[in-house]
Swiss-Prot record:
Biased composition (Low complexity): 1292-1302
Swiss-Prot/TrEMBL keywords: Isomerase, Membrane, Repeat, Transferase, Transmembrane, Transmembrane helix
GO molecular function: intramolecular transferase activity; sterol 3-beta-glucosyltransferase activity
Cleavable signal peptide: none
Compartments, as annotated in UniProt: Membrane
Glycosyltransferase: annotated segments: 681-1314
Name under which the protein is recorded: Enfumafungin synthase efuA
UniProt-listed Enzyme Commission number(s): 5.4.99.-, 2.4.1.-
Organism: Hormonema carpetanum
């Protein structure tokens, strides 16, 4: 064995040495034809059933291999006498009974100490009476259990057509291939001889029974018990089984002969040329057995080939002779080659040999059971085994495709890869996930069938397989050396979106994902994170899922630095992620963390150290293929025999893959070395005076509405001290915005005009229909255009000679907006920036209530259908009014493609934009049909202005006049405010009360002398203070007023006028916080006085007090909103040279991310050219639109209907002159390609500004030195290419390749200031 001398004693140096030894071990295990394979370990049942079979068939004998099998079986017995399903699990009753019977057949006497211990274990655990169905089935074939104790399994099942809800193809592939031979065996009901003779009531195992006199144990509960427990499906299947038993199992039924012939034909059709059936022991063994019972000669070709396939599963090693459940050459080869690609071996001839071996095994065949229900008929998958053409494996196919691309990126568009991708996409289930072998195979009710006590009859979508496919799709979408066509990209993005939605539903409360095919939560979680990592930067929901998971991984790390998990976590969820450390679990956890954290993270370094310290050289021997090689091999690996980390069927069958403990650590070490090597390259720090200006992301806040609306946004922006915030709003709010220290941008318009246009009280839909909304259109169009200008400064007008923050060109990095600012998504899309919507009113489609903007009365509509339609109607009329303007704006100002009405109705609502709702769930809970991107954050705590102090006269009024009611209508427009005040005063006089009126809503009356004596008029007063001194609150139902009243615990009378005021009025009444709402348009003295009396009664006190207590326990919604905005900011990629700066550029050749300053320096130094750089979007909106665009026929029909309706409506409106020139945007589309990209030009100018600013902060010598250091750093980083980018000629990861030889020393270079 070669010696490995490590001169670098750092963790990185040790990791390089460990990786080199692991790679050497891998190459030493490679087969001459290029592939890898290792034995698939499992429990003793397969070996025991192999013994049963050889004992049953006269032509077979156990004389030669019996002693070695006996030695292996006895060696697997545990100290308590049992046999387990896996090394770290307690004994299993069924496995122990089967192993015991096999040993008795092999001649071990029942008086042997090992057998006595086994007997004691079985009896202690309920005896043979408690074994599972398949064990009972095998016992019946020896007369140890009567056949009447076995459920009926009529062969006629195979005759049921595929369109029926029950047929053989609704079963999983493994269940189907195992069940059909069982149908034949069940028909024949054989009874074979045992060493004590042949008998239908054999007492050979009586010592294992608790009550040997009663062996006809029912396989299901009595029918009456099932009825009492409301187990209807179990009842139906059990009743059917009883009926079938009455008719002798239909053995003499006219169709039985046809069914038996079809079973036999099916088996012959599904036998591979090699003799295999599904490459799995149960169908191979069962098919040979069934065909022999059906009359086939043992010397026949089909039986001979089948026996060869069966014997290929046998393994002989130092422990003895045993039988694998299956073989895994394609799986082992794909995973190993994939790992070696990550280790930098792409392009190596040995790896090329492996990938060629994989290409040769692609299943381009015309048969396969998957064809019955798949969404495609294009073949192209890969199987798990050597010979299994009927059941390609989705999981294997994904890994093979990734391996082929990593080894040679030029093959991305090859027929081999594209056929595989086509087949893989066709296997996606309706729920968005993937199963392993079948599509939409989720009929879990089949597990209620009496013979399904292993819960393995279906192959539903699982998180681990879906995560792997998502990883494959992400890799395909990232390719630049051989990029996919737009059509393929669209298909992959749409498929990925469905997969991400599926994974969001499957994530558990801990943040982890259940692992179906590997142990367990660590496996499932690692697979999912490997997939989500490709989409986390552009998909907020994917990012949120990932962030939730990382803390769970931290919490499950063991004290020794590794990770592990017991298989008992499949039974007991409290054990999820817990167990003795193993190499595989540690590697899975590290792979997950390394995709989101720096390699210097403490948890990562401890995990890497565990892998290094637990690596072992091969001294005693190793598996070369499935054969044991004695002596030392080359390299080193990790121990694999102490834990099974693969899963066949949870709680029933677990698998030990030796290479799992080897190849996954290779990937983890490779990723660590790659990231640590990149981190070790010197990083440059810009002068602090420049950093203050440049290291501040630009946040654009678009706001429309009243003073109260703006106050909410101001509360949020106070949490963004690390950002440069620009608030674009009406000129009326300029003083308030600038008074809080934020940049103001004037977009025009007036909240008073908006309020007046909608003050009719009939809702926004009625306003649009009646034409009253028309007067706002021109004003709003102007405002919307101004919002875009606010997002992108005219950079030509900025001079770097003024190094204050406000002089730097403003280009929005994040856009924040309320839902009413309809242009927000267009501006964010053009700026390639993420969007955060902050709302004080429900604006998302739901069936729980209608759109608040369409409500014209204080009452919720019970129709969920109408409620959803109301949101679509609002979107329809909104698009009718502004859609053409938006499209002209998109074409002429934004340089974006036109959109249609179907986009507004069906697509925008599906985009996963973070939507922060600033109200409390105590008042308005989150509807169940809202997605995870919607956050009900809680009310924002309004900060009262310091100059709003109560006067002494007001305080005296409050003390002397009891009870007092506060009255405020915000900034609403009231036609005759004095008349309203006098009306309210009269009502209050009737109930003996006074009022404090806040007149911020109207200043048209001045003379206080005209006011009634029971009215006190104030210009401005903090609601938080005032409401503590009054007994009731009358207001218009604005979100802020409703919140203030609820927080104060005071009863409220709401007088809604328009928009969402009716929604909050209804909520107040619904929650018992005040009287029935009284709309302003229905205000009469006779109605008002009783409401005032009701308001001042004590009937609402308890509900109001409880609500106030609940709200005090809520977090501040402004904090949640601020955190969400900062999360979007933090997600922006950082520059690889100046890590303090955001990277808005990337090099198309190397994918390295660059800040504007670094890019400008490299361009000025002629290292690169601007055409070598592309803008790196902080959010890829084009991908978002393609992802959400549904291709289902139903949605296509709806789109067509909507477009026809829209075309008809716009034509009619055009005839009346409403919409003039509304289709001019089509010319804009034609002109779009010719115009210069304004964003790119702005970023280019900004980059030059930033570099100039940094140069100004340096002295002349440092400025020259800075450019030289940038060039040096750039060249070093080009030699270290990130793992995910495989676009150099060989496809190799240079960082991994170089990591085996050496790396760069860590250093940080500070640029000297003047």
């Amino acid at each position: 064995m070669p010696s490995y001398h490590n001169t670098d004693k750092t963790l990185l140096g040790d990791a390089r040495q460990s990786l080199q030894q692991a790679v050497d071990y891998s190459l030493g295990c490679q087969q001459p034809d290029g592939h890898w394979v290792a034995p698939v370990m499992a429990d003793a049942t397969f070996t025991a059933q192999y013994v049963f079979f050889k004992h049953q068939i006269p032509e077979l004998s156990l004389d030669e291999d019996g002693p070695e099998i006996q030695r292996w079986l006895l060696g697997e017995q545990t100290a308590d006498g049992s046999w387990t399903l896996a090394p770290d699990l307690p004994g299993n009753l069924s496995t122990t009974v089967e192993a015991y019977l096999a040993l008795r057949i092999l001649g071990v006497p029942k008086s042997d100490q090992a057998m006595l211990r086994a007997r004691d274990f079985v009896v202690r655990n309920g005896g043979v009476e408690g074994v599972r169905f398949f064990t009972r089935f095998f016992l019946a074939t020896f007369g140890l259990v009567p056949w009447t104790a076995i459920p009926q399994m009529p062969a006629e099942l195979i005759l049921l057509p595929t369109f029926m809800f029950l047929n053989i193809y609704v079963l999983s592939s493994w269940a189907r291939s195992t069940l059909i031979p069982i149908l034949l065996v069940r028909h024949h009901e054989p009874v074979y001889a045992l060493p004590n003779g042949q008998s239908a009531n054999n007492n050979f195992l009586d010592e294992l029974w608790c009550n040997p006199g009663e062996k006809n144990i029912p396989f299901a509960l009595p029918l009456w018990d099932l009825l009492r427990r409301y187990q209807w499906i179990e009842f139906a299947f059990t009743l059917l089984d009883h009926i079938l038993a009455l008719f002798g199992g239909l053995r003499r039924w006219p169709c039985r002969h046809m069914a038996l012939k079809r079973c036999t034909a099916w088996l012959l059709e599904h036998q591979e040329e090699s003799g295999d059936w599904a490459g799995f022991f149960p169908p191979i063994h069962g098919s040979i057995w069934a065909l022999l019972l059906d009359g086939f000669s043992f010397q026949s070709e089909v039986i001979r080939l089948g026996m060869e396939a069966l014997e290929r599963l046998v393994v002989i090693d130092p422990k003895g002779k045993w039988v694998q459940s299956t073989v895994s050459p394609c799986w082992d080869t794909a995973l190993m080659a994939n790992a070696l690609c990550d280790a930098g071996m792409s392009g190596d001839t040995r790896l090329a040999k492996a990938t060629q071996w994989l290409r040769d095994r692609q299943l381009m065949v015309s048969h396969g059971d998957w064809r019955n229900y798949a969404n495609t008929q294009q073949a192209g998958g890969w199987s798990f085994q050597y010979f299994n053409s009927f059941y390609p494996d989705v999981d294997d196919t994904a890994v093979v495709i990734m391996t082929l691309i990593k080894e040679d990126p030029n093959c991305t568009n090859s027929d081999c890869v594209m056929n595989g991708v086509e087949w893989m996409l066709g296997m996606q289930s309706r729920d968005g996930g993937w199963g392993a072998f079948d599509v939409n195979n989720n009929a879990r009710w089949l597990h209620k069938i009496p013979f399904s006590d292993m819960d393995s009859l279906v192959d539903p979508s699982t998180s681990d397989v879906t995560g792997r496919i998502l990883e494959c799709l992400g890799l395909l979408l990232s390719q630049r050396k051989s990029p996919l066509s737009p059509r393929w990209r669209h298909r992959l993005q749409a498929s990925s979106a469905k997969a991400i939605a599926f994974l969001a539903k499957e994530q558990e409360s801990s943040g982890a994902w259940w692992g179906r095919w590997g142990n367990n939560y660590h496996y499932g979680t690692a697979n999912v994170l490997r997939g989500l990592a490709w989409f986390a930067q552009t998909d907020p929901s994917a990012q949120m899922m990932c962030m939730r998971t990382l803390s769970w991984i931290d919490e499950t790390q063991n004290a020794d630095g590794g990770w592990g998990e017991t298989l008992a976590s499949y039974v007991d969820k409290s054990l999820a992620g817990l167990g003795r450390s193993t190499a595989a679990h540690t590697a899975w956890a590290l792979e997950s963390l390394l995709r989101f954290r720096l390699p210097s993270d403490q948890a990562i370094e401890r995990g890497v150290r565990w892998l290094i310290d637990n690596q072992q050289p091969n001294v005693d021997g190793y598996y070369y293929g499935t054969k044991w090689q004695a002596g030392a091999g080359q390299g080193a690996s990790w121990r694999f025999d102490h834990a099974y980390v693969g899963t066949g069927f949870p709680s029933v069958l677990y698998l030990g893959y030796p290479y799992y403990h080897h190849l996954f650590p290779i990937q983890a070490l490779s990723r660590y070395i790659d990231k640590a090597s990149r981190q070790g390259i010197e990083t440059l720090r810009i002068p602090s005076s420049s950093a203050v200006i440049l290291d501040r992301p630009n946040v654009l806040l678009m706001a429309m509405g009243s003073r109260g609306d703006i106050q909410v946004f101001l509360n949020v922006t106070k949490r963004l001290s690390s950002c440069r915030v620009r608030i674009a709003t009406h000129p009326a709010h300029q003083a308030k915005v600038e008074g809080h220290g934020f940049e103001f941008y004037d977009v025009g318009g007036s909240p008073e005009v908006f309020s007046a246009a909608l003050a009719n009280g009939h809702g926004i839909l009625r306003s649009i229909i009646d034409g009253r909304f028309r007067e706002l259109q021109h004003l709003l169009r102007s405002i919307y255009r101004s919002f875009w200008v606010a997002a992108l400064d005219d950079v030509q007008s900025h001079s770097p000679l003024k190094p204050e923050s406000s002089s730097r060109p403003f280009i929005a990095d994040v856009v924040v907006s309320g839902p009413s600012t309809s242009v927000h998504v267009h501006a964010a899309e053009r700026a390639q920036a993420p969007l955060v919507i902050i709302s004080t009113q429900p604006a998302i489609i739901t069936g729980d209530f209608q759109s608040p903007l369409t409500m014209s009365r204080a009452q919720f509509n019970p129709s969920r259908l109408w409620n959803r339609i109301s949101f679509h109607m609002l979107a329809f009329f909104d698009w009718l009014s502004f859609g053409p303007s938006f499209n002209r704006m998109r074409a002429n100002s934004y340089q974006l493609r036109s959109l249609d009405l179907a986009w507004a109705l069906f697509e925008f609502v599906k985009v996963s934009v973070p939507h922060v709702c600033l109200w409390s769930t105590s008042l308005a809970p989150k509807p169940e049909d809202w997605d995870n991107n919607v956050i009900i954050a809680g009310y924002s705590s309004m900060s009262d202005d310091a100059d709003d102090v109560a006067s002494k006269s007001l305080q005296a009024f409050l003390e002397t006049r009891q009870p007092v009611v506060a009255i405020s209508f915000g900034s609403a427009t009231i036609e005759d405010p004095m008349k309203l005040i006098k009306l309210m005063s009269a009502a209050l006089v009737k109930v003996g009360a006074s009022s404090v009126v806040c007149r911020s809503w109207d200043s048209s009356f001045e003379a206080e002398a005209d006011l009634p004596s029971n009215v006190f008029l104030v210009d401005s007063i903090p609601h938080g203070w005032l409401l503590q001194h009054v007994e009731g609150f009358v207001h218009h139902g604005g979100a802020g007023h409703t919140a203030a009243g609820a927080k104060a615990g005071v009863s409220q009378l709401v007088m809604p006028q328009f928009l969402d005021q009716f929604f909050w009025a209804t909520k107040v009444s619904e929650m018992g916080l005040g009287p029935t709402p009284l709309p302003l348009r229905e205000l009469f003295l006779d109605e008002l006085a009783p409401r005032m009396e009701d308001l001042l009664s004590s009937k609402y006190t308890k509900a109001c007090t409880n609500m106030a207590l609940q709200l005090r326990g809520d977090v501040d919604g402004a904090d949640v909103a601020g955190d969400e905005i900062l999360r979007q900011v933090e997600a922006i990629t950082t520059c690889c040279i100046f890590p303090e700066l955001s990277a808005h550029w990337y090099c198309t050749e190397s994918d390295l991310s660059l800040s504007g300053a670094a890019a400008a320096s490299l361009v000025s130094s002629k290292e690169i050219q601007w055409q070598d750089l592309e803008l790196r979007p902080a959010k890829d909106w084009e991908q978002q639109w393609r992802t959400v665009r549904s291709s289902s026929n139903l949605v296509r029909i709806w789109r067509a209907i909507v477009q026809l309706l829209y075309g008809f409506t716009t034509t009619i409106l055009a005839l009346f002159g409403w919409l003039k020139g509304t289709h001019g945007y089509l010319d804009g589309d034609r002109h779009l390609i010719k115009m210069e990209d304004p964003l790119r030009q702005a970023r280019l100018e900004q980059a030059q500004f930033d570099l100039h600013l940094i140069h100004q902060a340096c002295d002349s010598g440092s400025s020259t030195s800075l450019d030289a250091k940038i060039i040096e750093n750039w060249k070093a980083r080009k030699a270290v290419v990130i793992h995910e980018v495989f676009d150099d000629d060989s496809g190799a990861s240079e960082s991994s390749r170089s990591s085996l030889d050496g790396g760069h020393a860590d250093s940080v270079l500070d640029i000297e200031e003047k």
